[in-house]
């Protein structure tokens, strides 16, 4: 059932290949990945760009995922009725390629050495959501999320029972471990499980592995404990793919896929599958996607904040800053980014805790280059004091 459902899509992409190549320059991916077609934007004063539809935009320099999504979007004129296919298959490409080992199988093993997956797809027309969290033994996370959206009245399925649902829908169960993920886990355990996500437990999590038990510690000390064992979030950790596709009729889908935080406590769910945290879409306004320290970001629903800021009149770049500044007010060591796009295709981004944040854009533009990489300079600690 699962294979049959996607054979038609594969056929459409092949059929459109020759037509697409007649209108699209051949791409040297080595060149495109290193390309900055737009001067780096400083997020504290960035102007929003674009305004052309249809479009696909995604986090990080995941160019292949964007390029496939763009081709699928162009199966029909103006991308009509293809935004869901574009986002799902674009993110699937990243899952298959194990982008930065932070998306898909074989990356970010938890404390027990297991890789689990989170993913979401949101329809900006109906406001329907399909998501999976802690998905075990199924590689096609965002395709399973699509089945949650299309075949259930629920929004999120989690854990083993999400895997059972996937199998009932025709997905194959298989190990998500690879020699690389096993080696990553063994290296971590050999280093006394450092760093990790525990606090206020014994034995001391900063120097030893568990099992841990809670200890009676004054609540005022938790920040000190957190600092000793906290991860450096950024490249190669928490690099969720978030993708937005908009067609010429302003129909929007937004989606995410991630294998979560490396060496997370088993059972942990990040921001990626949470509507308003990992992604949010509303045809009346636009959409936003986020990436970074999900445990912190999900507490602020930054993609919902960005969409609502655009609804209130802010430009996309300004809207992306809203959540970033609010988070950084409370968490000075936080690291993350938000991309915001309005319904007309204007886009902007903001980031914090990094030097620069790359993203990939495809739209009808003066350069006529699909899947071009752009970047934004990140807000510094001093700039972040002006909270929106």
Curated annotation (Swiss-Prot):
Disulfide pairings: 94-99, 193-209, 351-378
Reaction catalysis annotation: N(4)-(beta-N-acetyl-D-glucosaminyl)-L-asparagine + H2O = N-acetyl-beta-D-glucosaminylamine + L-aspartate + H(+)
Name of the top EC class for this enzyme: hydrolase
EC assignment: 3.5.1.26
Superkingdom of origin: Eukaryota
Annotated residues for binding of substrate: 268-271, 291-294
Pfam families: Asparaginase_2
UniProt keyword annotations, A-Z: Autocatalytic cleavage, Disulfide bond, Hydrolase, Protease, Signal
Functional description taken from the UniProt entry: Cleaves the GlcNAc-Asn bond which joins oligosaccharides to the peptide of asparagine-linked glycoproteins.
Family from the record: Belongs to the Ntn-hydrolase family.
Name of this protein: Putative N(4)-(beta-N-acetylglucosaminyl)-L-asparaginase GL17147
């Amino acid at each position: 059932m699962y294979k049959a459902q996607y054979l038609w899509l594969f056929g459409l992409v092949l059929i459109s290949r020759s037509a697409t190549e007649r209108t699209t320059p051949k791409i040297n991916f080595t060149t495109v990945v290193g390309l900055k077609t737009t001067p780096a934007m400083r997020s504290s004063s960035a102007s929003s760009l674009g305004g052309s539809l249809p479009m696909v935009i995604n986090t990080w320099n995941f160019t292949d995922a964007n390029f496939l999504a763009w081709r699928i979007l162009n199966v029909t004129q103006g991308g009509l009725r293809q935004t869901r296919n574009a986002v799902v298959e674009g993110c699937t490409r990243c899952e298959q390629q194990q982008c930065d080992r932070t998306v898909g199988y074989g990356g970010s093993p938890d404390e027990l050495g297991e890789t689990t997956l989170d993913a979401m797809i949101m329809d900006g027309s109906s406001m329907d959501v399909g998501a999976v969290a802690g998905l075990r033994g199924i590689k096609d996370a965002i395709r399973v999320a699509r089945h949650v959206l299309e075949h259930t009245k629920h929004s999120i399925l989690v854990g083993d029972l999400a895997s059972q649902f996937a199998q009932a829908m025709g997905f194959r169960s298989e190990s998500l471990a690879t020699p690389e993920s096993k080696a990553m886990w063994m290296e971590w355990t050999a280093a006394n499980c450092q760093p990790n996500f525990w606090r206020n437990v014994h034995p001391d999590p900063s120097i030893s592995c568990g099992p841990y038990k809670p200890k009676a510690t004054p609540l005022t000390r938790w920040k000190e404990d957190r600092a000793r064992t906290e991860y450096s979030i950024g490249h190669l950790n928490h690099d969720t793919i978030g993708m937005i596709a908009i067609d010429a009729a302003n129909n929007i889908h937004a989606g995410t896929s991630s294998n979560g935080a490396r060496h997370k406590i088993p059972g942990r769910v990040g921001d990626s599958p949470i509507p308003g945290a990992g992604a949010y879409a509303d045809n009346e306004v636009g959409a936003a996607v986020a990436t970074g320290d999900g445990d912190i970001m999900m507490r602020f629903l930054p993609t919902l904040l960005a969409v609502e800021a655009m609804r209130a009149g802010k430009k996309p770049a300004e809207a992306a800053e809203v959540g970033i500044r609010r988070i950084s007010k409370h968490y000075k060591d936080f690291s993350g980014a938000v991309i915001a796009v309005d319904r007309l295709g204007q886009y902007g981004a903001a980031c914090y805790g990094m030097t620069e944040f790359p993203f990939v854009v495809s739209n009808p533009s003066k350069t006529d280059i699909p899947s071009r990489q752009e970047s934004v300079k990140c807000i510094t600690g001093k700039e972040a004091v002006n909270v929106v």
